[in-house]
Every structure is written in C-alpha cells, then in structure tokens.
Regions:
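Solvent-exposed, well-ordered loop and adjacent helix/strand elements within mature globular domains
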Residues: 1-315
Length: 315
C-alpha cells in the first residue's frame, strides 16, 4: 500500500517559482489575522520565507532546513487532481426591478424548505431578501461557490458571505446532466452547464430543483474572501484541501497545470507556492481546489480546470 505522503530529499521540478510575492503576501495575511495558525507553522513559514527571499531556487531548498514530502497522487504516480474555484460577481439590485427578479436570501429562522419550495415562494415577504439578481443560474452558482460579490450598480462590490444551508443534501447538477445524457462526462464544466442553460431556459429551474440543497448568505459590505480557516485568500497562493491529509496552514509547492481558454492542458505546469486555507465538500484525498480569484475570468478558468500535477508538502 502506497503512503499518501512520502519524505523525499529533493523536488524533481527545477522550474522557477512564479508567485513568490503573492505567497509572501498570503503569509503576511496569516500572521496578521490568525496568530494561532501562524504560531503553529512559524518554523516552516520562517524557513520557506528565507528560501524565497534568497531567490526560491528549487535546487537549493535543502540548504534552508526545509523538509519535503511528496504526495502520492490519485494513481500512486504523483498525479494530484487540481480543480479550481473562485468568487463570482453577481449583478443585482436591492429591490425587484426589470430583469432583476431572482432573490438571494438571508438565513431564515426556519430553514427546512427544499429548493423547489423556496423557488415557489416559501420565503417570500419575510424580509429575508438581500438582493435580486438577473439570473437564477448565477444565484445557484453563487451557492455552489459559497460566497461572492454583489454589484448593485453603485460603483462598489458588496461581499456576500456564507450564512448557512437548508439542511438538504447537495446534488451535483453537472452529474445529473451527464446521467441524463445531456452532456458527455468528458465535456463537463461550469461553462458547458451555462451553455446548456442558455439553450434550455424552460428546463433550467426543473434541473436546479433536483438539487434540494439551498445556501443562504449574509451581506458583509467591506468583507474579504475568506477560507474555512477564517483567513483572507490570495488568488493562486491558497488552496482548499482535505484537512485529514493536509491540515490548514500547510505549505505546498504545487505544479499547477497550464490550460487554454477551452480547458485543454498545454503540456506544461507553473510551479507555485500555496497555503492550505480552505476546505470543500468534494475535496477529498489527493485533490486540491485552487482559489482563482474574483470575477468572470477567474470563474472561466475555475470552471475548466480539472487536470493533474505533482505536489510537495514543505515543513
């Protein structure tokens, strides 16, 4: 049986680390927002920081007292699954008007309504409406991401943070579309779901209602995107991990697959330093969800990323 993590003496990739500044920014944010986590990993953070400030030459990493563990990968050959997530920006208004008719709700006192019941008006008129968007699907995807930004057309963005869930199990609509024969499994992505919805507007609500789970939000006007560790995230310097394997605060050297605008792997990787600061319901074992950032471009890449790379845990 292969061990999930194996101590090694070197990193087999000698490429340059491309995000040294962003990584140091992420460490600085950890230090200022979570003294507990910072103290737990202080020795590792200090050693890796010294290595980065000296140029982050991978061939010299051992000289800084940094221990290295290589992840086994999903297949035992170091192929760790990499997917992406992001913070969407939803265009909305504070009251229903014109095309803005799809409510985003705060957490109710009684939450045990299915998605279909909520769509049918179970929460209507209870003063829980935080915003009205122009897209039922965008609201749904906001729930999948767990947080995001709302653009009320007032020249600023309001952060909507996760407030809770209705208590029903989550069902992947992507999986449903594959099972229904609507989309081939190998073609599945968020963009493909959006394309399907654009072609089938009358069928969209019925599809979404098959996922009984519904997410509620709270408006944090000047809030920052935070992971489950409660720490603001720096794009492409933070990941969601399986905490049972990679605890929050762990430092990772990640081969991030480079993809084109259609999601095709370009045959090369970027070497990035990242910190595990979040979790995800689908993130299990040898799998990382890489935080891509805010807005449509980040969302486009996040929706297409489903490739493999090697990962080394530094300590």
């Amino acid at each position: 049986m292969r061990m999930p993590l194996t101590p090694v003496g070197m990193v087999e990739n000698q490429s340059a680390v491309v995000n040294q500044g962003d990584f140091l920014t992420q460490l600085s944010i950890i230090s200022s927002t979570s003294p507990r986590l910072s103290a737990k990993y202080q020795s590792t953070y200090d050693k890796v920081t010294n290595w980065v400030l000296a140029g982050a030459d991978v061939s010299q990493i051992n000289r800084f007292g940094i221990g290295i563990q290589k992840m086994a990968g999903q297949d035992g050959y170091q192929n760790v699954l990499m997917t992406g997530y992001y913070s969407p920006v939803i265009h909305a208004r504070r009251a229903p008007q014109g095309k803005y008719q799809h409510p985003i709700y705060a957490m109710p006192k009684y939450k045990r309504f299915s998605r279909a019941q909520i769509y049918a008006g179970a929460l209507k008129g209870k003063g829980l409406e935080l915003a009205y968007s122009d897209s039922m699907l965008d609201n749904f995807l906001l729930g999948v991401q767990g947080s995001g930004y709302i653009d009320f057309g007032e020249n600023n963005l309001n952060y909507f943070a996760y407030a809770g869930q209705n208590g029903f199990p989550y069902t992947s609509v992507g999986r449903l579309l594959v099972e229904d024969g609507e989309i081939p499994k190998e073609k599945m992505s968020v963009q493909v779901i959006k394309d399907w919805a654009a072609r089938n507007p009358s069928r969209l609500q019925g599809l979404l209602e098959r996922n009984l789970s519904y997410v509620f939000f709270k408006n944090v006007p000047n809030g920052k995107v935070k992971g489950s560790a409660g720490i603001p995230l720096v794009p492409l310097a933070s990941v969601a991990s399986d905490r049972s394997l990679i605890p929050s605060g762990s430092v990772l050297l990640v081969e991030m697959p480079e993809i084109d605008d259609e999601g095709n792997w370009l045959g090369k990787h970027q070497l990035r330093l990242m910190v595990a600061l979040d979790v995800g319901g689908a993130v299990k074992g040898q799998h990382f969800d890489l935080y891509q950032g805010i807005g449509d471009r980040a969302g486009h890449i996040a929706g297409l990323l489903k490739h493999y790379g090697r990962v080394w845990v530094l300590n």
